[in-house]
Amino acid sequence: MLSVAILAAGKGTRMESSLPKVLHKISGKSLLQRVIDSCVELKPDQIFVITGHKSKEVEKAIPNDKKFHVVVQEPQSGTGHAIQVLCREVKKHQGKLLVLNGDVPLIRPSTLKRLLNLHDSKNADVSLITTKKTHPHGYGRVFLKGDFIERIVEEKDCNDLERENELINAGVYCFNWGILSEIINTLQSNNNQKEIYLTDTISLLKNSLSLEVEDNGELQGINNRIQLSECEEIIQNSIKEKHMLNGVTFINKASCSISEEAEIGKDVIIEANTHIRGNAKINSHCIIGPNTFIENSNVGLNCEISNSTVYASQIMDYIKIGPYSHIRPNSEISSFSKIGNFVEIKNSQLEEESKVNHLSYIGDSIIGRSTNIGAGTITANFDGQKKHQTKIGKNSSIGANTVFVAPINLGESVTTGAGSVITKDSKDNSLAISRTEQVNIENWERKKS
């Protein structure tokens, strides 16, 4: 039987944040979620998340699954105290207990599996991950005696000689839970921090093993915003390298960010300052950017999107968007259409070969095939209480500076006069015009101030 305990009770004081440390995000996922994802790969029987500081907030981030259990640690008196609380809450201490911190977002499932395999093969009381750091400031030092761990000394309790040891504790343990439960309550807070250390169990257990991991990048804990940024960079580099090996070009990859869920096709060019978030999909032969943000949207083949934002929308094939366009949620832009500069589209459908080239707002609308929307067109869709729809049939020509006061339904091949305010429906092949006749007053003199 395998149980997992994720330590997520700390305040994270050095983050200088009102948000619990484990809820800070890297590439769209919280630190806690990344640790959970790695643990789930092990197929454990149960996962305990030990919370404390702002427990209710942290609890909301835990999956709603019967495998997950919340254990509240009050007060937060150290890692050893956290496991003491867990052992009191859980009556059956069977099999293995994997313990790790909730702030190690880069830990690989494969490394955790290696630890479990070592533990099983040697029938250990405890096995833990260690690594060597050239400048190990802040980490507990691990001291070996032959093949076994003799003791672990926390940084603040080290003397000068002990601080020279470069073998550090990564904070990932696999215990024989039954044996651990017999000694856990003997731990005391006899140290400079006045906390109960889980590392003190090592000297009480006979068969304590070390799994030394060479790549200590994955063991990076997050204690401040600098380390958060470093981990973000590691993950982003990994994501972008994967896409580049699959045929994607980044013009300036350091200035771009890509979510792990995003899909990008071959021969896509990602220009500088482009950010692709959530479940976005960019199909082949597109040019995206520069200065473009796409989230939870599908972009078809051979599209060009520059200096624009696209949220939760469908962009079909051979479409040009931008510069400075804003495609808001629930919009669908059909193939061979064009959205030009300073255009906002919201909850609207544009059929094939439609054009909205300049300075327009299209909201809650259906625009027919091969329709041209003139500069400055506005769909006035909100009456102060609810939104209304505008429908414009195919092959229509909308004059510059037209305002549609929705609800409006225009037929096919309708033309509107420039500057019109359209308040009534129009039939097929009609001209809709609504403006006062121009009056010229000759010999007019402006009043002088």
Swiss-Prot record:
Main location: cytoplasm
Active-site residues, Swiss-Prot/TrEMBL: 358 (proton acceptor)
Pfam families per record: Hexapep (PF00132), Hexapep_2 (PF14602), NTP_transf_3 (PF12804)
Location relative to the cell: Cytoplasm
Catalytic activity: alpha-D-glucosamine 1-phosphate + acetyl-CoA = N-acetyl-alpha-D-glucosamine 1-phosphate + CoA + H(+); N-acetyl-alpha-D-glucosamine 1-phosphate + UTP + H(+) = UDP-N-acetyl-alpha-D-glucosamine + diphosphate
Positions of region (N-acetyltransferase): 247-449
Any single GO CC term annotated in Swiss-Prot or TrEMBL for this entry: membrane
Keyword Cell wall biogenesis/degradation among record annotations: yes
Cofactor, how bound (note): Binds 1 Mg(2+) ion per subunit.
Chain spans, region Linker: 226-246
Record key words, sorted: Acyltransferase, Cell shape, Cell wall biogenesis/degradation, Cytoplasm, Magnesium, Metal-binding, Multifunctional enzyme, Nucleotidyltransferase, Peptidoglycan synthesis, Repeat, Transferase
Pathway involvement of the protein, from the record: Nucleotide-sugar biosynthesis; UDP-N-acetyl-alpha-D-glucosamine biosynthesis; N-acetyl-alpha-D-glucosamine 1-phosphate from alpha-D-glucosamine 6-phosphate (route II): step 2/2; Nucleotide-sugar biosynthesis; UDP-N-acetyl-alpha-D-glucosamine biosynthesis; UDP-N-acetyl-alpha-D-glucosamine from N-acetyl-alpha-D-glucosamine 1-phosphate: step 1/1; Bacterial outer membrane biogenesis; LPS lipid A biosynthesis
Domain of life according to the entry: Bacteria
Binding site for acetyl-CoA: 375, 418, 435
Record InterPro entries: Bifunctional_GlmU, GlmU-like, GlmU_C_LbH, Hexapep, MobA-like_NTP_Trfase, Nucleotide-diphossugar_trans, Trimer_LpxA-like_sf
Function of the protein: Catalyzes the last two sequential reactions in the de novo biosynthetic pathway for UDP-N-acetylglucosamine (UDP-GlcNAc). The C-terminal domain catalyzes the transfer of acetyl group from acetyl coenzyme A to glucosamine-1-phosphate (GlcN-1-P) to produce N-acetylglucosamine-1-phosphate (GlcNAc-1-P), which is converted into UDP-GlcNAc by the transfer of uridine 5-monophosphate (from uridine 5-triphosphate), a reaction catalyzed by the N-terminal domain.
Subunit structure: Homotrimer.
Protein name: Bifunctional protein GlmU
